[in-house]
Amino acid sequence: MLERARGLSPHALRALAELERQVVEADGGRLKLEWGTLEARSGSQVEDLLWWQGEQLLGFLGLYAFGASCLELVGMVAPAARRRGIATALLDAALPLCRQRNYPRALLVVPGASVAGSRLAQDRGATLDHSEHALVLLDRPSSGPEDPQVGLRRAVPADAAVVTALLEAAFGHPAPGLYEQLASENERTLLVEAAGTPVGTIRLTRRGDAAGVYGFAVDPDWQGRGIGRDVLRRVCHQLRGEGARRIGLEVAVDNESALGLYTSVGFTIVTTEDYYALTLGALE
C-alpha cells in the first residue's frame, strides 16, 4: 500500500533505517537518504512516499528540494521485494508531486551499479546529467602542517553575502537555502580565513556517529596553497573529537583535483551515483 507522507513519524523513521540496513547489506555502498532532512520534514506537504506491506516497509522514495530549479529523488526497495513494480509505482507517484511544485526538472539518483535503476530512469525518458563519487573517512585523517595564518570560524546569517560570493566563485552558483543553513542549529557553516580575509567555506553536519562535509569551496585565487587540505584535516579531526566515526562527502567524478585532495586526506570511494535528469514538462 502506498502512503503519501506529510512528515515522517518515529515509526516510519525506524522502518526507513531498517530498510536502509537491508539494502546496504545486500548491495553494498551507501544510500543518499540525507537523514537530517528526513528527520526535519515540516509536514506541510507530501515529500516522502512509502510502500508498506502491513507493518513492513518495502519501498521508499523521497523528494529533496535544492533551490528553485531542481528536486532530487532518492529511493530504495527491499531486496526481497524487487521485481514487483514497487520502484515504478513510487516514481510514477512522485512525478505529479514534482510538477505540482512547479519544478522544471528532477534528478533521480541511481547507484552506479544498479542496472534496474538505470533502466527505470531511461524508461521515463531521463538522460544522464552527471555522476558523483561518495567517499568516506573511517580513520584519522592524514597528518600534515597547519598554517597559523589560516583560521576557521562559524558563519552567521550576516555572513550570507560572503559565503554566497565564495560558493559562486568556486561552483558558479550559491547554495539554495543558505540563510536557513547559516541559522540552523543542526549544521555548521564555517568561514575559512587567511590572515583575516575570507577565502573559503565548508558546511558540516552530524547525526550520531556519522558526519557529512558539504559545500567545501576555496576561492580560486587562493587555491594551490594547501589551504583546502589543511582545512579538511582540521574539520575531520574536530568531527572525530566530537564522536563522529564515519565522515562522508561527495565529489563529481570529473573533478580529479578535488578527488585527489580528498583521498590524500584519507577518504576512500564507497560508491558512485548517477544523476538522471527528468524534464517534468515532457512527462505529461
Regions from the PLM with identified roles:
Residues M1-T37, P145-P174:
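Short amphipathic alpha-helix that is part of the acyltransferase structural core
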Residues L8, R21-V24, G28-R101, V110, ...:
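Conserved donor-binding loop and adjoining core beta-sheet/short helix segment
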Residues Q56-G59, A116, G196-G200, S257:
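Glycine-rich acetyl-CoA-binding "A-motif" of GNAT/NAT acetyltransferases
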Residues R83-P96, D123, G215-V218, G224-G241, ...:
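Conserved acetyl-CoA-binding loop-helix of GNAT-fold acetyltransferases
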Residues P96-G112, L120, L239-E250:
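Conserved GNAT acetyl-CoA-binding A-motif
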Residues L107-G117, P220, L249-L259, Y275-L283:
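Conserved beta-strand-loop-alpha-helix junction that forms the acyl-donor binding cleft
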Residues Q122-H130, T263-T272:
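Conserved acetyl-CoA-binding loop of GNAT-fold acetyltransferases
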Residues P176, A183-A194, P198-R207:
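Phosphate-binding active sites in nucleotide-utilizing proteins
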